[in-house]
C-alpha cells in the first residue's frame, strides 16, 4: 500500500487535472466553433464555479477514505471534515476571483455582457450549492458545516458586490461596454 503522503499528492494532481479539463476543453471547443476564446473561457468559468463544490466534496470523500482508516474516527477525522469546509470556502473565493479577473479583462475584448452572464450565473449557483450541499450530503451535521462556511460565503458576496460597484463606476467614468 502506498504511503499516505503519496496518496495525498496523487489526489491533488488529480484535482488539478480535473480543473484544467473543466476549464480548457470547453473553452477551446467553443473557440473552434465560435472563433472566440474569451466566450469559451467565460462559459468554462461558469461551469467550473458550478462544479467546484461538487468536486470538493467528491475529492474530500476520497481523502476521507485515505485518512479515516488511520485515524479510526479520532481527532484526525474532525480535522479532515474541517479541511472539507476550508476547501469549499477557498474554492468559492478562488472561483469568484477568477470570475472577477475575467470580467475586468474582457472589457477590452468587447464581450463583457456574455462574461457577466456566464460568471454571474455560475457564481450564484456556486453560492447556492455551497449553502445546500453540506446539508444534503450530511444531514444535520452538514447544517453545522454550512454554518461554519457562512463567513466565507458572506466574504465572497462582499467581493461580488465590490466588483459590481467597480464595474458600475468605471462605466460612469466614460468606459463603455459593448457586445
Where does each model-flagged region fall?
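Canonical alpha-helical transmembrane segments
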Residues: 22-31, 55-60, 90-105
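Cytosolic juxtamembrane helix and N-cap/initiation of the first transmembrane helix
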Residues: 2-55
Amino acid at each position: 500500500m502506498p504511503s499516505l503522503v503519496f496518496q495525498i499528492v496523487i489526489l491533488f494532481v488529480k484535482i488539478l487535472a480535473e480543473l484544467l479539463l473543466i476549464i480548457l476543453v470547453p473553452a477551446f471547443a467553443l473557440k473552434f466553433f465560435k472563433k472566440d476564446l474569451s466566450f469559451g473561457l467565460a462559459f468554462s468559468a461558469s461551469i467550473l464555479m458550478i462544479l467546484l463544490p461538487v468536486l470538493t466534496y467528491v475529492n474530500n470523500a476520497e481523502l476521507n477514505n485515505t485518512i479515516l482508516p488511520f485515524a479510526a474516527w479520532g481527532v484526525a477525522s474532525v480535522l479532515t471534515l474541517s479541511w472539507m469546509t476550508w476547501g469549499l470556502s477557498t474554492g468559492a473565493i478562488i472561483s469568484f476571483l477568477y470570475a472577477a479577473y475575467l470580467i475586468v479583462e474582457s472589457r477590452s475584448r468587447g464581450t463583457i455582457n456574455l462574461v457577466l452572464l456566464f460568471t454571474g450565473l455560475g457564481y450564484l449557483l456556486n453560492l447556492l450549492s455551497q449553502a445546500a450541499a453540506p446539508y444534503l450530503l450530511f444531514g444535520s451535521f452538514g447544517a453545522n458545516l454550512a454554518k461554519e462556511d457562512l463567513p466565507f460565503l458572506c466574504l465572497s458576496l462582499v467581493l461580488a458586490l465590490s466588483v459590481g460597484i467597480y464595474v458600475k463606476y468605471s462605466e460612469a467614468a466614460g468606459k463603455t461596454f459593448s457586445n
